[in-house]
Amino acid sequence: MPLGDCNISTPDNKQNRKNQEIRVPRVRVIGSDGEMVGVLSRDEALAKAEEEGLDLVEIQPQADPPVCKIMDFGKFKFEQQKKANEAKKKTKQVEIKELKFRPVTDEGDYQIKLRNMRRFLEEGDKVKVNIRFRGREMSHQELGREMAARIEADLGDDIVIESRPRLEGRQMVMMIAPKKKV
């Protein structure tokens, strides 16, 4: 982008000043080819950038004198945006998966739910275990506590219990998270 382009005020523009936005009298200049040009006055550096048809972009404002590079500002912003998008893609949102049990859940169903729970934890998600009581089962809450203890024992040391089993209305709730890998 040549020097005559207008500056659009965005939060990103505040990070890297360019051309006339640079206010310091002397800057260390890196050429468009990546070679060190040296310490020049701001006006000399701007003239050199204009001569090449590029922008003078402040790369390290905290340095003494600040480091500026002669480059195409639009291309520079595009590359920064691309890097930010790549970093954003690599981060994974932790989801909370919910599995519902009953105090009298059959062995086959229990094993399937346990296998799913292991898979969710391996993927890095948290699991909310919900043990529901129906009718007179509420008078046998110890069965729910035994079920929660069995789940904890079957999953082994690969987990962190974020919240111990607690009664919420007619259901017992427990939160399980995967253990952080070092």
Curated annotation (Swiss-Prot):
This protein's record includes keyword Cytoplasm: yes
CC per GO annotation: cytosol; membrane
Compartments, record wording: Cytoplasm
Gene3D superfamilies membership: Translation initiation factor 3 (IF-3), C-terminal domain, Translation initiation factor 3 (IF-3), N-terminal domain
Organism, as annotated: Xanthomonas axonopodis pv. citri (strain 306)
Biological process (GO), any one: ribosome disassembly
Molecular function GO labels: ribosome binding; translation initiation factor activity
Family (UniProt): Belongs to the IF-3 family.
Protein name: Translation initiation factor IF-3
Start and end residues of each stretch annotated as Disordered: 1-22
Described function: IF-3 binds to the 30S ribosomal subunit and shifts the equilibrium between 70S ribosomes and their 50S and 30S subunits in favor of the free subunits, thus enhancing the availability of 30S subunits on which protein synthesis initiation begins.
Keyword annotations of the record: Cytoplasm, Initiation factor, Protein biosynthesis
Assembly, per entry: Monomer.
Chief location category: cytoplasm
Pfam family, any one: IF3_N
Classification via InterPro entries: T_IF-3_C_sf (IPR036788), T_IF-3_N_sf (IPR036787), Translation_initiation_fac3_CS (IPR019813), Translation_initiation_fac_3 (IPR001288), Translation_initiation_fac_3_C (IPR019815), Translation_initiation_fac_3_N (IPR019814)
Lineage of the species this protein comes from: Bacteria, Pseudomonadati, Pseudomonadota, Gammaproteobacteria, Lysobacterales
